[in-house]
Amino acid sequence: MRKDICAIYAPFHPLTPKYSYKGIFMLLILHPNIQESDPAFKKTMSHLQQLSGVKIKQHEVSGQLQSLREIYLLGDTHALDIEEIESLPAVEKVIRISEEYRILGRHKTQGGRSGFHYQGLAFDQESLHIFAGLCAVDNPKHVEEMLRALQANGLNCTRMGAYKPRTNPYAFQGHGKDCLPWVFDLAGKYGIKVIAMEVTHESHMHEIDKALADAGRPCGVIMQIGTRNTQNFELLKAIGKQSEYPALLKRGFGITLNESLNAAEYLASEGNSQVIFCLRGMKSEFGAPHRNMVDFAQVPTVKRLTRMPVCIDPSHSVGSRDIAPDGVLELCHATAQGVLAGANMVLVDFHPAPTKALVDGPQALTLNELEPFLKDMEIARKAYLERVTVWQDA
């Protein structure tokens, strides 16, 4: 079975109204690297187009080693013979799908490693990437200091907020497109491969794409959808309709986990299955004194229900630099809990001068704390892998 993305079509759900076909869907996984011009593909499509009451939709994802193509049979597929469909020359495997999260979900008959590659990096449920950086871009000096520190510590990913939706209309809203040219130039200078950057409007995607093109595309961008926009369906559709940039979707702070996962499915149903799901805490008085109720215990839950890489955002979950009696920051304890549970990405705020930060300075770690933070997470990651080995051998 191939070791790459295997996309499965969208569920019939209030959040995904685009394809409201009822019944059990059928997924056809085609042989790797097959093209539309291949005789086997043409013969397969000719047969499928003769099926009654079935809609056909194709989806293609380019991995690092393989081009992956899948066909979805939508509608009443109960009467279709799996063995007959599987005998078609372009088909490698056939799967019936009836569960929720049909594109991003984890399905019983589906094997192999899933995920995607972007900018030469693997994003899946086995990897771990640290995205340390500025919650909000403030000035070139601080951005360069941050990126220099990342390079010195062997990191090639970061977070940089150019567009900042704020609860207070008078608070700093970010520099927007004006800062993109020098942010991307500095990213190229310091070997940054991927930047996680929040967008709040479709126009922001176009501004980012233009700025990257003007800079010679020195890095890539993951389009981050913040917790306030988890159910901004027009934004989800816009990001889902393009496949140039992966998406990172934060859990909605006032909705259920199921609703947030279906928002991710909304992205994938539009065609972009390169989605990372981010746990960032839930808005609740029971989380006090933390900023939000830390929800990193649900890292394995999301991995069980879906095939998405799972990110954690300890900065916006904990929201402070409070130190526990053992001398470790509570934020670092929370981060380690998520990594110990198998998190695949950490989105964490750092700043060269937190007291001068324009957004969320009180929760930002300092550059002097970057090295011990990374060592701490390395310990947690090794412990997670050892835990997995213990249970696999049990």
Question: How does the language model describe each region?
Answer:
Residues 165-220, 232-234:
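N-terminal active-site wall of soluble small-molecule enzyme domains
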Residues 128-143, 169-173, 196-198, 227, ...:
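Active-site mouth loops of central-metabolism enzymes
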Residues 128-134, 158-160, 194-197, 221-225, ...:
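Hydrophobic faces of well-ordered beta-strands that scaffold small-molecule active sites
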Residues 173-196, 239-242, 298-311, 363-384:
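Alpha-helix-loop-beta-strand connector modules within alpha/beta enzyme cores
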Residues 159-177, 350-361:
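Glycine-rich, proline-tolerant flexible connector loops at the mouths of alpha/beta enzymes
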Residues 116-135, 166, 304-320:
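N-terminal small/glycine-rich loop or linker at the start of catalytic domains
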Residues 15-130:
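Non-catalytic terminal accessory/regulatory regions of metabolic enzymes
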Residues 231-350:
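Catalytic alpha/beta core domains of metabolic enzymes, predominantly
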